Amino acid sequence: ILVIDATSGVTTQDKKIAGLIQEAKKPAIIALNKWDLVANGREKDPELLREHTERIRAELFFLSYAPVVILSALTGTNVKRLFTMVEKVRQHSTRRAGTGELNRVLKAAMERQAPPTRGNRRFKVLYAAQAKESSRSPVQAPLFVMFVNDPKLIPDSYVNYLCARIRDKWEFPGLPILMRLRGREGAPTEVA
């Protein structure tokens, strides 16, 4: 849980910590604390909530998968919502995408926006499946393995596009999507 002081907004230190979370590919929830001091009696004002959430999202755009919970630890406002979100992230970490449906989602995404070509070669997905991470952590990010013709043909931006389509289909709040590409030679390449 990345706790941000609502009175000071996202600081340089907050950005560094968020960057470490993103680099380590860890689950995350952003808690905007001290809401009582910012809201001045307008705690439930939807416009104020939206404005602050959008500002956080803009500054921490690289943690787009992390839900934002606005709360006040002092008054107890939305503290239960934070714990509910922690449980939701944990539950979704066990969600499995069926192989057939995953392949249909990826095929539709590639038909909607074809992968770029390198020279006269085009990236092709032979098939994809969700794998189980061998971590002992109780909350694991979903790991997808794509068996492809050549992992070197796909730019990171296109992997991000495919991860976004997976996220559109299956809700994985607070969880980064991990993608491994395996070429015909079998050596895995972790991309996203």
Q: What name fits each language-model region?
A:
Residues L2-V3, S8-A192:
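C-terminal-of-GTPase-core extension/linker across diverse P-loop GTPases
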